[in-house]
Design a protein with these regions (language model features):
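Short, basic, alpha-helical segments at the C-terminal edge of helix-turn-helix-like DNA-binding modules
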Residues: 57-64
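Short, solvent-exposed amphipathic helices
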Residues: 69, 115-126, 130-133
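Hydrophobic alpha-helical connector segments
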Residues: 54, 67-96, 137, 147-150
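Amphipathic alpha-helical segments used for helix-helix packing
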Residues: 92-118
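Helix-turn-helix
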Residues: 9, 13, 17-54
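Short hydrophobic clusters on alpha-helical segments that form packing/core surfaces
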Residues: 10-18, 88, 131, 154
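Hydrophobic/aromatic-rich alpha-helical bundle segments in the mid-to-C-terminal region
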Residues: 115-121, 136-195
Length: 195
């Protein structure tokens, strides 16, 4: 049986509590949830701000893996892009969806220079970069703008799911598909049928 280190417990507790309760949760509650003393926390992290940033960064790869199709997925770019929105629908349908942790944190912090906001921006850029790479593969005319628009649809769908406290009903997938259609980005099957 492996025992997690105090640092790992703090990062895990911080990730859960900051996303569920907000970044203004007290250090006492955070340390209690992690089973770590405040003294230990401040020996491991210079500040709560550093802990916010590191907890976001540590969760990034697993959050991306939930959303992005893997490199072994060889479907057309359009299908790979729409997979992100389908997986978002699945996360929302689980019933405990609290929105995108990166957008939520950045909105709550209200300071673009805060270390947590910097990390949030970095991971949101990963999503935009994923869309951009796929759009380039698909031969989209303006992949930069289209990638930003897809990211906005993703973030808007996340916000809608939280505000309305209900499933998205596929609206993110439908909206992204309509945008891709308007840009002429089709899967190979659709392109063959249209040609």
């Amino acid at each position: 049986m492996t025992t997690s280190t105090p640092r790992e417990r703090l990062l895990e507790a911080a990730g859960e509590l900051f996303h569920r309760d907000g970044v203004n949760i007290g250090v006492d509650a955070l340390c209690k949830a992690a089973g770590v003393s405040k003294k230990s926390m401040y020996q491991l992290f210079r500040s709560k701000d550093e802990l916010i940033a590191e907890s976001l960064a540590s969760r990034g790869p697993s959050y991306q893996a939930l959303l992005h199709p893997g490199p072994e997925d060889e479907r057309p770019a359009r299908d790979r892009i729409l997979t992100v929105f389908e997986r978002q629908d699945e996360l929302v349908a689980q019933g405990d969806f609290l929105g995108c942790p990166y957008v939520s944190t950045a909105v709550e912090l209200k300071n673009p220079e805060h270390p947590g906001s910097v990390v949030a921006r970095h991971f949101k850029q990963h999503l935009t970069d994923f869309f951009h790479r796929e759009l380039v593969k698909a031969g989209a005319e303006d992949p930069g703008t289209l990638a930003i628009q897809l990211t906005m649809i993703f973030d808007g769908a996340s916000a809608r799911a939280v505000v309305r406290a209900q499933d998205l009903g596929g609206i993110g997938v439908l909206t992204a598909a309509a945008l891709l259609d308007a840009a002429g980005v089709r899967s190979s099957e659709l392109a063959t049928q249209a040609g």
